């Protein structure tokens, strides 16, 4: 039974529901920038704090544990920001999202994040043990094992998933135009580099966050420009 307001009341309710629909903030692309900066800071701290050779006992004894611990503490926050970045990309795709490539895009992003956390957890465990019995741990070879496992997971498997994420994202971009074509082709080239690098290039992990930084900066600029229009 309709109230005195009748159809007018129903229309007002419908309009109210439309107005309350959640929308992505225009500044949400900051999440990708935050991810890039946090991950690059973490990688730089680790690279400059640990000896290049895991068998170098003297180098391990001079490790600045506090710097490495800080680097590892940044990783979870980088991961949270990356999830927001994925959400921003999906929001820009909207109804044009291709189910096949979107599945690869989303799955590779989650696998990248899982392996990033895994490598950070292994490194964190080794560093924690180092704080309890440094000399015994270095001599036992546990440090070398932990370092090699962390290196393999981060530089081989994590980077492969980053490459797949880049390829699927750039393919979606070429189909939908969410960012310029030259950025997509650059992403393809960088993704191939990550897939073929086989962990042989020490600074290769920086490629992915730099690419995310480029894409996020473009999206943020486009969103803010649209907001001022």
Task: Please state what every model-predicted region is.
Residues 14-229:
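Hydrophobic, aromatic-enriched alpha-helical segments typical of multi-pass transmembrane helices
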Residues 3-14:
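Short, Lys/Arg-enriched N-terminal segments with co-localized hydrophobic residues
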Residues 1-5, 22-25:
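Exposed boundary/loop context
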């Amino acid at each position: 039974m309709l109230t005195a307001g009748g159809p007018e009341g129903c229309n007002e309710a419908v309009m109210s529901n439309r107005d309350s629909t959640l929308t992505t903030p225009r500044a949400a692309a900051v999440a990708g920038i935050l991810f890039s900066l946090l991950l690059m800071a973490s990688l730089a701290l680790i690279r400059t704090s640990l000896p290049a050779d895991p068998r170098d006992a003297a180098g391990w004894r001079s490790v600045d544990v506090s710097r490495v611990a800080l680097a590892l503490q940044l990783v979870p926050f980088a991961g949270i920001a990356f999830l927001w970045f994925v959400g921003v990309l999906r929001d820009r795709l909207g109804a044009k999202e291709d189910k096949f490539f979107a599945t690869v895009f989303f799955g590779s992003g989650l696998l990248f994040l899982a392996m990033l956390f895994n490598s950070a957890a292994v490194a964190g465990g080794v560093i924690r043990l180092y704080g309890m019995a440094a000399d015994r741990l270095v001599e036992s070879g546990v440090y070398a094992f932990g370092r090699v496992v962390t290196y393999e997971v981060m530089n081989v498997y994590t980077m492969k998933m980053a490459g797949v994420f880049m390829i699927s994202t750039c393919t979606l971009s070429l189909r939908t135009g969410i960012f310029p074509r030259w950025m997509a082709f650059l992403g393809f080239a960088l993704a191939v580099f990550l897939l073929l690098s086989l962990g042989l290039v020490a600074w290769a992990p920086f490629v992915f966050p730099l690419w995310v930084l480029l894409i996020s900066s473009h999206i943020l600029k486009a969103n803010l420009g649209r907001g001022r229009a």
